[in-house]
Amino acid sequence: KKNSIWSVGKASVKEIDKINILQASLLAMKRAIKKLKKKPSHILIDGNKIPDLKNYNLKAIIKGDQKIASISAASIVAKVARDKFITTLAKKNIGYSWDQNFGYGTKQHLKAIKKIGINKHHRKTFSPISKFKIHNI
């Protein structure tokens, strides 16, 4: 814990729809790295892509969350942050059952979208969503 530093970076739904999920993930990583209070000697990233950042020692590790404890920990931090965000959305956006499905495209969630439509928190470029008539935005 003493030698650990972390931050969470985010990308908006509009950014994801505009630049795609991969580029938005890289943008969120970049934001998280830039928010760190101290520049780390190296940064390990789960996957095969790294954000475009000069003057940082970045290394992508495929399946890194299964191989490296610090990457596993980062995955948990990211999941907890996302779940907290989704829980907040669920309280403000009744009807989508986000408190149960956490924003994943479950049958229940898709049924709710068919009934009440999508809102500004839905990614319009996500395949199941893009098939629905867009309203309630």
Regions found by a protein language model. Name each.
Residues K1-I137:
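RNase H-like, Mg2+-dependent phosphodiesterase core
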